[in-house]
């Protein structure tokens, strides 16, 4: 349908054509007919809600607060937990002292969820100094920092300690970096609020990274811990015969040198440490990378002695060997292959050769298929593999996948899965998944199971959003289980600055999948988890102010919202499918200045940010093993348009 202006323009042009016809020869060509050029309704972003822009204080630099209060109840097996919490997050920019933020929590709960506690963390980021120096400082509950070379390992990555204390990270634009941390170590506990629990003792860590030239850099770091609880007793569940929790002292040293050539990168690493006067344990590993026009090769060697650790935190140990991997990409083909040779130094750990390979062929813009496999030959042979086909239609993106695995106990598993991501409008995501699995045991017959799952997020107008996933499982046979688990979150913004959130989770007889063969650990059978449920009810108040337009991160170009999740990508396709779960308590930093943590379902959001390009940095410190983030997933660039809601799902993948 034409607009009034379009109709008027057509009438005027028609009249002009008629007048011209009367004065020109009859043979003159007729003027081309006018065509309206209308903006499609679906391409025009909605105007901002007047309620959102009213009474905004635009004086001063960007600043804001978020206050969240609520209650939560949990049940896990035979344990019941009751929680109440008050969380306060805030940020404010300064001209000369960098960007500041605060993260405070007042938590009350019974013994099943860690008891009562409180914590406050203050961050100062990008504080400028002369000669190209800047600093990030943290006071409160922080993770001890790791130097870039400590995080860049392809095969092995050092763990990081969480503590109540202080940390500082100084960087110079020429590549020099100096870090330090001191505090009391501890651990996170709680279902909805990740409350910190100190375990006593002291931890000190220092490190420095120095570039020697444009192609060479080195780093050295040391950690010392005194009178601390060992990592295997960190939860306080195990005690000595006298009822006292044993404590230890630990010291570790890390050193690395990296060389970067035109197409080759080489990094040598040394880790040495001891615990409570024991003998020094040493680890050496070498990582190399060669990048060609269409291929990328990773190769290395390692020798990691038994009981190797970084402080009291465990590191991969009791193995020696090497690995080689190659990734190739050309036109429609992507394939990779790798081999690991692993031997136990003590003779009591894992031994063997491991082979893996994967291939994907993009047959059409809308069609691709591929396969991958992992094989461990020998007396304790095992394998896993899958075939898949991906296609896109008007019904969205689809994947059909067949998986098969067998361990050394002649336990064979087979599973066929269909994943479907449905086409939706902006701010809506819906995916469904269906699978059928069978497990054959040499001693217990065959167990069959079927499952159906769905995951979605939906924006109901301007004030209500819904996010959740549901999975149903039915099985029969010796290990058959009837299972159900669901997670549903509802957010209602009932006033300009106020939001009410309700979340519910329930799980019955859920199982972990066995379709993984890892060179460093044994394969895992189906493991039934205890019945659990949880609910939470929260009310949130948010305040934004400052110039420009009360949004952090940009100029007065309008504002939008950014939300998303960090999830465990079980099938490695980079897309969050219905049966894949979120990663909780992961720090997400916006533009190096403003940070949030993912909730129990892996969700995060920045409710109002400047339009334009932004960078997200995801810190993998609290990811569960064996999951990790590659360089691309840990550093994400997103573009936010005015009045738009952008969603990004960040995939953590199993370590190779």
Q: What are these model-predicted stretches?
A:
Residues 31-392, 397-409, 416, 535, ...:
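Outer-membrane beta-barrel channel domains
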Residues 562-568:
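A short, amphipathic beta-strand motif
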Residues 582, 592-603:
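Short, acidic Ser/Thr/Gly-rich low-complexity loop/linker segments typical of extracellular
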Residues 596, 606-607, 650:
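Hydrophobic core positions of the immunoglobulin-like beta-sandwich fold
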Residues 605-615, 621-622:
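Short Pro-Gly-centered beta-turn/loop motif in secreted/extracellular proteins
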Residues 621-648, 652:
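Structured interaction patches on ligand/partner-binding surfaces of diverse proteins
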């Amino acid at each position: 349908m034409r607009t009034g202006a379009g109709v008027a323009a057509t009438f005027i042009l028609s009249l002009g054509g008629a007048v011209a016809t009367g004065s020109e020869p009859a043979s003159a060509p007729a003027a081309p007919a006018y065509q309206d050029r209308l903006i499609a309704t679906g391409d025009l972003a909605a105007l901002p809600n007047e309620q959102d822009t009213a009474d905004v204080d635009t004086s001063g630099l960007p600043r804001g607060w978020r206050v969240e209060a609520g209650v939560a109840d949990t049940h896990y097996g035979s344990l019941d937990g009751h929680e109440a919490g008050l969380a306060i997050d805030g940020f404010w920019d300064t001209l000369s002292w960098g960007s500041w933020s605060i993260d405070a929590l007042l938590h009350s709960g019974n013994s099943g969820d860690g008891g009562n506690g409180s914590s406050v963390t203050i961050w100062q980021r990008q504080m400028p100094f002369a000669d190209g120096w800047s600093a990030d400082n943290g006071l409160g509950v922080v993770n001890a920092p790791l130097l870039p070379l400590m995080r860049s390992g392809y095969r092995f990555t050092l763990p990081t300690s969480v503590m109540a204390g202080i940390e500082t990270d100084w960087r110079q634009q020429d590549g020099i970096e100096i870090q330090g941390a001191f505090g009391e170590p501890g651990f996170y506990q709680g279902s909805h609020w990740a409350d910190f629990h100190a375990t006593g003792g002291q931890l000190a860590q220092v490190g420095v990274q120095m570039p020697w030239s444009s192609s060479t850099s080195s780093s050295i770091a040391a950690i010392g811990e005194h009178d601390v609880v060992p990592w295997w007793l960190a939860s306080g569940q195990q005690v000595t015969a006298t009822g006292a929790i044993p404590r230890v002292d630990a010291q570790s040293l890390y050193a690395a040198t990296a060389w970067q050539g035109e197409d080759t990168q080489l990094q040598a690493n040394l880790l040495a440490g001891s615990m409570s006067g024991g003998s020094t344990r040493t680890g050496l590993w070498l990582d190399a990378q060669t990048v060609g026009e269409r291929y990328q090769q990773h190769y290395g060697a390692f020798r990691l002695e038994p009981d190797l650790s970084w402080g009291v935190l465990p590191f991969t140990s009791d193995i020696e060997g090497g690995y080689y991997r190659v990734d190739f990409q050309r036109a429609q083909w992507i394939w990779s292959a790798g081999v690991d040779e692993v031997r136990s130094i003590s003779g009591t750990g894992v031994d063997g050769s491991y082979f893996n390979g994967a291939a994907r062929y993009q047959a059409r813009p809308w069609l691709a298929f591929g396969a991958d496999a992992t094989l461990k030959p020998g007396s304790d042979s095992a394998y896993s593999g899958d075939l898949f086909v991906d296609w896109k239609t008007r019904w969205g993106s689809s994947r059909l996948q067949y998986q098969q695995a067998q361990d050394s106990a002649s336990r064979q598993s087979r599973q066929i899965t269909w994943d479907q991501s449905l086409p939706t409008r902006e701010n809506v995501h819906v995916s469904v998944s269906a699978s059928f699995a069978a497990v054959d045991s040499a001693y217990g017959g065959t167990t069959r199971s079927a499952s159906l799952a769905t995951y979605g997020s939906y924006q109901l107008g301007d004030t209500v959003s819904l996010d959740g996933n549901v999975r149903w499982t039915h099985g029969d046979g010796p290990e058959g289980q009837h299972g159900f688990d669901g997670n549903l979150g509802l957010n209602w913004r009932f006033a300009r600055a106020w939001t009410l959130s309700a979340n519910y989770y329930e799980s019955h007889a859920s199982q972990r999948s066995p379709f993984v063969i890892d060179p460093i650990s044994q394969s895992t059978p189906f493991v039934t988890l205890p019945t659990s449920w949880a609910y939470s009810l929260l009310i949130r108040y948010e305040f934004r102010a400052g110039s420009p337009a009360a949004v952090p991160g940009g100029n007065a170009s309008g504002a939008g919202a950014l939300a998303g999740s960090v999830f465990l990508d079980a099938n490695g396709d980079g897309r969050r499918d219905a049966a894949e779960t979120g990663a909780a308590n992961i720090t997400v930093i916006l533009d190096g200045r403003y940070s949030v943590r993912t909730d129990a379902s892996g969700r995060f959001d920045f409710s109002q940010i400047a339009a334009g390009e932004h960078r997200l940095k995801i810190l993998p410190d609290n990811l569960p093993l064996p999951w990790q983030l590659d360089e691309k997933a840990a550093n994400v660039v997103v573009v936010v348009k005015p009045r738009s809601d952008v969603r990004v799902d960040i995939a953590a993948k199993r370590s190779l």
